[in-house]
Amino acid sequence: MQRPPPEDFSLKETRPHLGGGKLSGDKLTSTYDLVEQMQYLYVRVVKAKELPGKDMTGSCDPYVEVKLGNYKGTTRHFEKKSNPEWNQVFAFSKDRIQASFLEATVKDKDFVKDDLIGRVVFDLNEVPKRVPPDSPLAPQWYRLEDRKGDKVKGELMLAVWFGTQADEAFPEAWHSDAATVSGTDALANIRSKVYLSPKLWYLRVNVIEAQDLIPTDKQRYPEVYVKAIVGNQALRTRVSQSRTINPMWNEDLMFVAAEPFEEPLILSVEDRVAPNKDEVLGRCAIPLQYLDRRFDHKPVNSRWYNLEKHIMVDGEKKETKFASRIHMRICLEGGYHVLDESTHYSSDLRPTAKQLWKPNIGVLELGILNATGLMPMKTKDGRGTTDAYCVAKYGQKWIRTRTIIDSFTPRWNEQYTWEVFDPCTVVTVGVFDNCHLHGGEKIGGAKDSRIGKVRIRLSTLETDRVYTHSYPLLVLHPNGVKKMGEIHLAVRFTCSSLLNMMYMYSQPLLPKMHYIHPLTVSQLDNLRHQATQIVSMRLTRAEPPLRKEVVEYMLDVGSHMWSMRRSKANFFRIMGVLSGLIAVGKWFEQICNWKNPITTVLIHLLFIILVLYPELILPTIFLYLFLIGIWYYRWRPRHPPHMDTRLSHADSAHPDELDEEFDTFPTSRPSDIVRMRYDRLRSIAGRIQTVVGDLATQGERLQSLLSWRDPRATALFVLFCLIAAVILYVTPFQVVALCIGIYALRHPRFRYKLPSVPLNFFRRLPARTDCML
């Protein structure tokens, strides 16, 4: 049986017609755009006046129907209004126009059949063309006609023109491609939008001490701690070591806060009166907008805050003030960058405070052209369909393209730009299937399905070059990796100052505060989780929403979870890094064994020259590296990096390993499967444990050289050191180096297969393995 051909997961270079002109070499012959031009017929329905009444009451409920061939778009209707204003735009794709005339009909909405008020007909051959930066076409009044062509009462203000997707009316227009979508919410869900991430701050709460606390039970020493809450985040200090009514902590609690600040900081001082019972001794609420903002390492002033306590009086909750106070130093940290992405794929590294931002070094332009070969993501009317849209994120700016309805080869041709402040950043483009066009919210909360994702690191791009490639869209499923299609992108990174960009390579990757007052790894993990939750919640509340599953996929939430496949990939990445050293070791072994006598003799000569002229060693090394770099320039990568299934071990992963990777946390699998995976993990951990133990043994043997743990071995080593010191003192260094080098490169005739004396001595040294249980 013939095996099916392997799927093509490679990157392909494309030659699209960008901006109406061909791509010539690395430059554009037309500087219009990074996308292919798409022609549209635009119809702007502005308003009508003096419409005649059609009802028995003498009034009308007018709306406008714009018809072009089989495509039909309608405005909203007004109740009993003879001078309505709509100001709606309709866009018809020129590629799908199969008519010669455009008809705009004003109708009166009725229960049985809508009445005709009048119409305006346009010959498409007479419609003007407009391309920005031309000014918008001014709408005109047109007298309405009946079906016979006779003038009737009423006028309609319209503007009709041919344009491209660069027209400012394009984003808000009704599109003929989406004619099957109805409803205001559904139409809002298919339009292109630009979103901004909320401005995130680190909130530092330094809890110093409290005074004059009043515990209920005065006969015991209080076990007091402070609990702090900001929105959904809750942290607490340790129990104070000074068990008095004046406890001290001097402990930092870190939160993530987003502008505009909606929730206050709520602090409560609590006493642990029993293992599962805590008593509130006082609390206070502090609005975040009034807090100090710190931009450097200088400490802010501390303040005393009064504590309040709620007590029950006659079944009612009443607030009482008393003399208890808490001493704290609270500030919003503007000198840090709030990490909301995976550190490996960061798109922004600037601090929160805008005062600390440096000028941009360039501009990133991204053209999202089209996709091909998309897979069916859902069924509609008994057949597979896909309603695809793209999301791109770089820095604080998110963009969402319009949704192309029911197409496996959608064409977006939308272009976006971002300011670039650091070249060592990544732009992420994701493709999703829109599941909210036909009442998705009502059907059990449908989620937008992921089709694939592309990452492009800006530092891998040449400046001022247009990259046009087709990227494979790969998604990992429990049954293996699957190619969902391809997305065609055009990317250009323009540098405003080459010197400034080169200077960036000498600067720290993160703002200074990350190094002056570093946060712990556990703090960063917790804060990153909170930041992603805040960003996804805020973007979900936008209109139209950028849904939580989309935001989390773009931010790589959950990428830190255990994965056998990813562990194997990382292990082989380490082996790939070490392969160069291993190859050098094998080459040196061949030199020592005289596999190629001519090469070995040349190495002898080179070694003697370097020993006699040691000042040539460093220049020789750096000159060698320079020549290697120049030699490799001919074979430098000419394409951006892309998802590599072989490197990721996605094409060879075992189904059970993939099922484990997609398991929830905590696990939701049956106990027998969990037991099997636990035993497998124990087996792997046992091998790692053995390797770590062997490394520790070698280190302990080095320590035991002078520890007198083995008195004979230490005595021999000390005596050897004394003799070596005397010999090295009276013998020139060059002679010693020559002797050692010639001995290491000696002919196999003078070698023995038994281990050397130093190695035998080292292996006999004691380690602490004897003390292990």
UniProtKB/Swiss-Prot annotation:
Biased composition (Basic and acidic residues): 1-16
Tissue expression notes: Accumulates in vascular tissues, leaf primordia and flowers. Highly expressed in roots meristems and in both vegetative and inflorescence shoot apical meristems (SAMs).
InterPro entries in alphabetical order: C2_dom, C2_domain_sf, C2B_MCTP_PRT_plant, C2C_MCTP_PRT_plant, C2D_MCTP_PRT_plant, MCTP_C, QUIRKY-like
Pfam families (alphabetical): C2, PRT_C
SMART domains: C2
MF terms (GO), sorted A to Z: glycosyltransferase activity; metal ion binding
Cofactors demanded by this protein: Ca(2+)
Membrane topology, record value: Multi-pass membrane protein
Residue ranges of the region described as Disordered: 1-24
Mutant lacking the gene: phenotype: No visible phenotypes. Plants lacking both FTIP3 and FTIP4 have a dwarf and bushy phenotype due to an accelerated stem cell differentiation causing early termination of shoot apices associated with an increased STM localization to the plasma membrane, but compromises nuclear localization.
Residue ranges of domain C2 in the record: 22-142, 181-305, 345-471
Keywords: Calcium, Cell membrane, Cytoplasm, Endoplasmic reticulum, Endosome, Glycosyltransferase, Golgi apparatus, Membrane, Metal-binding, Repeat, Transferase, Transmembrane, Transmembrane helix
Subcellular location: Endoplasmic reticulum membrane; Cytoplasm; Vesicle; Cell membrane
Residues that coordinate or bind Ca(2+) 2: D55, D108, D110, D115
Record carries keyword Cytoplasm: yes
Residues passing through the membrane, by range: 574-594, 608-628, 716-736
GO CC aspect terms: cytoplasm; cytosol; endoplasmic reticulum; endoplasmic reticulum membrane; endosome; endosome membrane; Golgi membrane; plant-type cell wall
Source superkingdom: Eukaryota
Family assignment from sequence similarity: Belongs to the MCTP family.
Subunit structure of this chain's protein: Interacts with and regulates subcellular localization and trafficking of STM.
Function per UniProt: Required for proliferation and differentiation of shoot stem cells in the shoot apical meristem (SAM), thus determining the appropriate balance between the maintenance of shoot stem cells and their differentiation into other aboveground plant parts via the control of subcellular localization and intercellular trafficking of STM in the shoot apex. Prevents intracellular trafficking of STM to the plasma membrane in cells in the peripheral shoot meristem region thus facilitating STM recycling to the nucleus to maintain stem cells.
Name recorded for this polypeptide: FT-interacting protein 3
Source species of the chain: Arabidopsis thaliana
The organism's taxonomic lineage, starting at the top: Eukaryota, Viridiplantae, Streptophyta, Embryophyta, Tracheophyta
